[in-house]
Structure formats: C-alpha cells, structure tokens
C-alpha cells in the first residue's frame, strides 16, 4: 500500500437547521448528516461522543442519523429535497452545487468554520493483492501488462475525483505537461477499470469481497478498513 497524494481536504458545514444555527437546537432532537461513502465508521464514533458532550453542556438529548453514498450523488439528493441538517462531503464543488441550486447554504460557507470548513484531510493509496503479484508500486505501473484497476465513478464519487486528479497530477509531472500524453495515460487507466461503482465503499466491496481487479485506488482509511473487514 503506497501513499501517493497527501493533504486532500474533506469539507463539512451546517445547513440552516443544524445545531450551529441560532435557536434550532432546542426544537430539534434528531439531526441528519448527509455524508460520503467512507465516513460511516468515523461518524458512528463521532456522533456518540458528540451526543454525550451536547447532553453534558445543554441537558438535551440529540440523535444523529446518517445518510451515505457517493459525494456527488449525495449533493444531488440534498438539492432534490433530502432534508439534511449537516452535510459532510468530499469536494468543495459538491457543496457549491448545493449553494447554487438550492439556496440551503450560504455562499460564504468556507469562512464559517476554521481551516476553510475542512476539518480533516486524507490521502489516496493503492491497495494490492497479497504479495503484490503484479508489482504495482507507482502510477506508471497501473497501465502495464494486464493490470486491472478498481476505482469508483468520478461522476458520482468524490473519492473517485481525487483518484482522477491524483492520476492527472502524476502524469502532468511525468510527461512534463504534455496534454496529449497526459490524456492518453488517464484514458488508458480508465480503460482498465472493469467496473465503476457509484461510491468508494462499493469499489472496496468489488475489490476485496468480489475479488475483481488487481489494485484498488482508495482513501487511506478505506484501505485499512478493507484489511480489517475482508
């Protein structure tokens, strides 16, 4: 497993009904956090800790419910009417889409919380089969021989877009900005993807449980989860 691109921001913010909105907490005992695929385990623990802290500080009980899926798909669900109280998505553009198409979030959302409303970061890694039989160590190895790649669909998954951008960044450096070579590399990479799941968790299942592909492109925490679960 090789780290390839660090410092990827994950953006989070409160919608108009969230606990951070003045006067809303007293009337609300349930919150819905609409998040992307890989945060299930994170927020399961975080929500429990938050509920205890909120109870200690205010005397009120709060229940936090979760909705998970590809980041872009989740943004579309909120735009189409899913009543989220908080969204924690993988891309700034997904939150900006909610701003532009629903009016549920203020345009200046990035300035509302510290670190441009990006509370944590992650990185993209390669997860390979035991013993690394295809000898995959870097981006160039992904387009050698008969290597098959598992990655989500960048049209619906935030993590998939980071995978795409990481591949593009590597190719840009490798080919010294030659756009034709960069496009050819990225195109060849995606030709080697036998399936494009809508979200990163689906890709993890495809690789680890269904045993499809030689390498999984994933968030670092998702790679660790695959090792523990499968």
Model regions: which residues?
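A short secondary-structure junction signal
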Residues: 137-138, 160-164, 227-229
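Bilobed "Venus flytrap"/periplasmic-binding protein-like clamshell domains
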Residues: 39-45, 154-183
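Bacterial N-terminal signal peptides
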Residues: 3, 7-20
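Active-site regions of metal-assisted phosphoester/phosphodiester hydrolases
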Residues: 13, 151, 166
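Ligand-binding pocket segment of bilobal, Venus flytrap-like solute-binding proteins
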Residues: 175-230
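Sec/Tat signal peptide C-region and signal peptidase I cleavage site
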Residues: 21-27
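N-terminal segment of the mature folded domain
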Residues: 28-156
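Cleavable N-terminal signal peptides
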Residues: 14-15, 25, 37
